[in-house]
Amino acid sequence: THRGLMSTVGAIEHTLTRDAGWLFLKLGESLERVFRTVVILRTKLPALVSDEPKVDLPLFYSQWRSLLRGLSCLENYRKVFGARLEPIDVLQFLLFDAQTPRSVRYGASAVKEHLDRISSASDVSQPARIVGKLAAELSYQGHDLIRDGQILSFLDHVLTELGRAHEALSAVYFGS
């Protein structure tokens, strides 16, 4: 149940020692969250950004609102943009907002931060390099992709890089 899950999460957050085990737990949580966000965006966006005329505007905006709600971002979006719901703003928010825990940029940065804390100070791991490059792309070149209509191919690229990071993480830390 939801209550049982929240009790477990609370126990972990308030009692677990902040050692390597906790860092790996947070790394896995962050990696799963950013991966899930990208998969949902990649699945939903083709229908939302189609070139077909928007005949039923209430339905059109309801779909964008549902996307935000499904990613637990509607309230955060409204704090930034108010009631205005523009697709370009939603995309920029979900992909590139540095303060929103469910945005792709925030998620990639969180994964990178956890990897950096796990890695030794003198040795940057292969997974950290992969995710670091992805985080930099999300920070510095992402907005142009929306304007150029390359968002779906960029999401495919993000999924590929997250997969590479996962494989490298497994190889480096778990020997598989």
Regions found by a protein language model. Give the residues of each.
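Alpha-helical transmembrane segments and their helix-helix packing motifs
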Residues: 1-176
